[in-house]
């Protein structure tokens, strides 16, 4: 590995660990922060040498390895490198090789999983190895061995206290575990070598390092608020469960089987009890009073939003913060971030008139006063979740977001000048859209017409039709089903350049897949195929990747664009795409690049970002820092987009 003419040693590594904390539930930062955390096996590979394994239940981590962790001459590489980097950080802190607030520098690390995800490949080591057909596959015995050696046993009647299985308890399995650990390094190395021909941009590694720093900083938790909310929630749940038992006469109303049978007995059978369906049934006003009472109570019990307070407590580290809330390249194809743990990108909004009063009542655990003033205790708790994430002492949170970023980006790509003019001037995109659609002057757009412009703007930009309008809630906005086809036609007639952009992108992909070569479109977009991937190069220089793309003849005689990718459910599968969907990927990926570059500028300017939500950056700054400078820095577009 060479950088700037100097040779850098490549150090591939993989570890097996033990902690009493549950990794999937609390994340790697809290998992490694637990006092019981240990690294029990270490396997590594230097450049092209053989894999070495160190049994850390018998030996210590070699001194040279500890030195290498902070030596920039070694490039550390792992699959999901955040796990190794955070784990080794905890160990180096214990050894006083790092300060209590220091983290291993992510700029010295490379993550093979990120390389795979950038190419639209599986995020699972096993799945990626199988898909790529590398000769070193992941050892399938790992799940059982991890469960045995790396997690505490679950309490049973015979063994009421959990215990830890040690190597001496199963020496043969321990030898298998060491072999499994070593094989993971071989598999990771094989994947890394396979992907080396398609290099990840240096700028993307800068962004990954920034992402790691954001996760390292963490977000402070308002502990009294979380504690108060949990107390109120548990008390309310006990009351609601007792009430539900009284209404239904069931021993266990949580049992779907029992509750469905009870509903059938009441003459109101419901085969599915999802939140949306239950709410729809309640809104219909056709349910018998007792059934409505039972279902309303069940909704209160199933309020998953308030469970986020429990996550704040469970995932909080000793520094009072929750770390690891965002995953880099979590969305394949676009490269957008994905939420983890608290899912900060999906927190309920708040519209309470007096947040400070509501917060003080929750901290005082005064459910009676909350009920008296607001009437709906679970709803108040739900609305206050956002306020449970706070600034550090002596700091405040400052926020800036990109307004209607996708509408701006798609108009910029397509050259839809009237939309761009609206953003350059008054910024009222919904009114401007309605004006274009219905040929009505802006100053005569009423509330109902604006609503049509709004739902059309939000739903139709990516070749959506009537179904997209319905999914966006058009029928709940006062529109009738008969109006929807006309709304689609009017929007497309008003946005001819965007419509043309859909078909230009589709033709570009079809041309590349059928005849090869390179197709260039406006704003520097470039479509080409290389090493079994379709690539779309963005103005930022980043490439969107689609694995094993091809044109497939459908029964209707038309060609469809297909590729291998992650479906909505677990597993890699064959997926279809089309012009509007390709445009959606391009637009969302470009919006991601704009936010990513903005966060680099904010960090460089003394605004350390601690989290970001969709197109909004949140920085934790000392009291006295203003928002104006942050907004100026964030709004300064990259050179490629000027």
Regions found by a protein language model. Give the residues of each.
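A short acidic-Thr-Gly-centered motif at the start of a beta-strand
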Residues: 1-9, 66-70, 380-396, 600-604
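Conserved catalytic palm subdomain of right-hand nucleotidyl-transferase polymerases, strongest
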Residues: 12-13, 79, 109-111, 391-405
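Active-site palm subdomain of RNA-directed nucleic acid polymerases
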Residues: 195-207, 594-617
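Conserved RNase H-like, two-metal-ion catalytic cores of nucleic-acid enzymes
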Residues: 1-123, 352-355, 359, 411-413
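A common structural junction motif
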Residues: 477, 634-641
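Conserved "right-hand" nucleotidyltransferase catalytic core of DNA-directed polymerases
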Residues: 2-17, 21-23, 34-36, 41-43, ...
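Generic long, charged, amphipathic alpha-helical segments
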Residues: 429-448, 554-610
């Amino acid at each position: 590995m060479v950088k700037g003419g100097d040779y850098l040693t490549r150090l591939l590594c993989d570890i097996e660990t033990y902690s009493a904390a549950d990794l999937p539930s609390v994340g790697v930062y809290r998992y490694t922060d637990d006092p019981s955390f240990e690294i029990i096996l270490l396997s590594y590979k230097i450049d092209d040498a053989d894999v070495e394994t160190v049994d850390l239940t018998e030996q210590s981590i070699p001194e040279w390895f500890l030195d290498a962790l902070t030596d920039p001459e070694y490039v550390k590489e792992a699959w999901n490198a955040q796990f190794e980097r955070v784990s080794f950080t905890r160990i180096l802190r214990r050894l006083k090789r790092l300060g209590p607030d220091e983290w291993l520098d992510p700029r010295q690390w490379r993550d093979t999983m990120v390389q795979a995800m950038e190419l639209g490949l599986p995020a699972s080591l096993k799945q990626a190895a199988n898909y790529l057909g590398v000769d070193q596959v992941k050892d399938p015995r790992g799940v059982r061995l991890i469960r045995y050696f790396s997690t505490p046993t679950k309490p049973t009647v015979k063994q009421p206290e959990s215990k830890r299985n040690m190597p001496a308890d199963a020496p043969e399995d321990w030898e298998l575990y060491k072999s499994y650990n070593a094989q993971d390094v071989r598999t990771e190395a094989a994947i890394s070598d396979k992907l080396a021909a398609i290099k990840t941009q240096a700028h993307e590694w800068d962004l990954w390092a920034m992402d790691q720093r954001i996760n390292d900083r963490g977000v402070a938790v308002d502990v009294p608020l979380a504690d108060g909310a949990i107390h109120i929630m548990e008390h309310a749940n006990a009351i609601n469960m007792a009430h539900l038992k009284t209404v239904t006469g069931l021993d266990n109303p949580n049992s779907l089987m029992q509750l469905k049978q009870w509903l059938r007995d009441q003459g109101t059978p419901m085969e599915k009890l999802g939140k949306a369906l239950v709410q729809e049934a309640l809104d219909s006003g056709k349910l018998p009073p007792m059934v409505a009472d039972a279902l309303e109570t069940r909704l209160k019990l199933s309020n998953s939003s308030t469970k986020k307070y429990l996550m704040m407590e469970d995932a909080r580290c000793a520094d009072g913060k929750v770390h690891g809330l965002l995953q880099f390249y979590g969305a394949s194809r676009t490269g957008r971030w994905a939420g983890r743990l608290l899912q900060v990108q999906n927190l309920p909004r708040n519209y309470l008139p007096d947040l400070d009063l509501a917060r003080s009542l929750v901290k005082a655990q005064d459910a009676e006063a909350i009920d008296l003033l607001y009437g709906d205790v679970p709803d108040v708790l739900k609305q206050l979740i956002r306020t449970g994430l706070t600034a550090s002492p002596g700091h405040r949170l400052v926020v800036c977001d990109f307004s209607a970023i996708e509408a701006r980006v798609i108009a910029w790509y397509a050259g839809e000048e009237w939309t761009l003019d609206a953003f350059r001037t008054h910024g009222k995109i919904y009114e401007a859209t309605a004006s274009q659609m219905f040929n009505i002057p802006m100053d005569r757009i009423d509330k109902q017409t604006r609503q049509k412009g709004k739902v059309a703007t939000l739903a139709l930009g990516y070749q959506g039709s009537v179904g997209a309008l319905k999914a966006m809630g058009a029928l709940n906005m006062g529109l009738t089903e008969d109006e929807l086809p006309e709304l689609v036609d009017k929007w497309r007639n008003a946005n001819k350049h965007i419509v043309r952009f859909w078909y230009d992108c589709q033709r570009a992909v079809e041309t590349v897949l059928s005849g090869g070569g390179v197709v260039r479109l406006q704003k520097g977009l470039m479509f080409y195929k290389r090493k079994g991937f379709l690539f779309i190069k963005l103005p930022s220089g980043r490439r969107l990747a689609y694995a094993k793309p091809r044109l497939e003849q459908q029964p209707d005689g038309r060609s469809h664009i297909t590729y291998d990718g992650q479906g909505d459910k677990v597993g890699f599968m064959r997926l279809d795409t089309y012009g509007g969907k390709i445009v959606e990927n391009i637009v969302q990926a470009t919006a991601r690049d704009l936010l990513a570059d903005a966060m680099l500028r904010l960090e460089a300017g003394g605004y350390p970002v601690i989290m970001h939500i969709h197109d909004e950056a949140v920085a934790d700054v000392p009291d006295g820092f203003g928002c104006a400078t942050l907004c100026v820095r964030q709004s300064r577009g990259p050179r490629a987009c000027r």
